[in-house]
Amino acid sequence: MARRDLRDRLFWLANESDIKSAKTTDSYFVNTKEVLDKNKIDTEATMEVFARDIPYPEIWGVLTGIYEVAKLLEGLPVDVWAMDEGLVFLADGSTAFYEPLLVIKGRYRDFVEYENPMLGLLSSSTSVSTRAARFRVAAGEKQLLSFGTRRVHPALAPLVERSCYIAGFDGLSNVLGAKLVG
């Protein structure tokens, strides 16, 4: 495999500008936007994000990542509704009695490129907070501290710590994560 030096960054990471400008999306979303723009198609759309399955016997999760999705969509001409961060949601595709975690309404071409990063922001954070909440339940009243950032990419450390904090952890080990959580 050929070695490639990065010219504009130190690490193989998307920066905030890359994410906000939709450079982290899949190419078919870019192609879709180009077709919609070229043909001046202004179709109104509603995107609903559900959790239909969780890899645990219990069908609940803890929603996180909403703050980041709100920041991603900030300034776009769309209407957004979301459950509050930290809420416990049910992920049971066998029943009609569950609601979307996130709803976006607007012209599809205004938010099509953000679908991929939105789902990534939600699923990465929510998977950590859901797992962390299960540790919180298992620990009961015992003190629970997060030391998980030594096993994730350093860029994700604040996300992991925030997700653990929202899930009920008593303390955080990562310096930057703890500082950002407050």
Report the location of each language-model feature:
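Ordered alpha/beta subdomains of enzyme catalytic regions
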Residues: 1-180
